[in-house]
Amino acid sequence: MTEAAPDRMTLVLGGARSGKSAYAERLIEACPAPWLYIATAQAWDEEMRVRIHEHRARRSGSWQTLDVPTALPEAVAAATGPVLVDCLTLWLTNLLLAEADLEAATDALARACAAAAGPLVLVANEVGLGIVPDNALARRFRDAAGRLHQRLARDADRVVLTVAGLPLTVKPSRENP
């Protein structure tokens, strides 16, 4: 399936294995290459190594991959062409584990996204649809993710929720309705 070129900033949300990354890749691939894939995942275990390998194997040679566990605002600010960030959820996890200031990091990322030089597609897991977590750390993470998503959705030109591989437009674009 071919997608229309993305707007200046598109936020793609969805659950685990919902098809959000593949959809985001199709959006960026509608732009002239080369494309930059900013990956935030860290291979903590074998399952993550396999997931990272699968994601990389799916992409063509026109993609450049930049592994950025925590310095995401700086990487977005330095990019000069079409960028896919996958994913904000793991970036937030990395920051939480590093005991970083999540509010300051959210602000820095929002500023970098607003000033991005080219089309930007951001991917994140929607984690706020389930039950209330039973521990403080998980609740803090869920709340921080919700605040991050709200901030970026407000600034985004378009917001899409992927469910079962289907993109559902939550915030339509004026340019690509």
Task: Specify the residue positions occupied by each region the protein language model found.
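Conserved P-loop
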Residues: 2, 10-78
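Residue-level signal for inorganic ion chemistry
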Residues: 24, 55, 84, 125, ...
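Short, hinge-like loop/turn segments at secondary-structure boundaries
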Residues: 54-56, 82, 138-140
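Structural motif
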Residues: 11, 84, 121-123
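Short, low-complexity, intrinsically disordered N-terminal peptides in bacterial proteins
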Residues: 1-10, 78, 115, 172-177
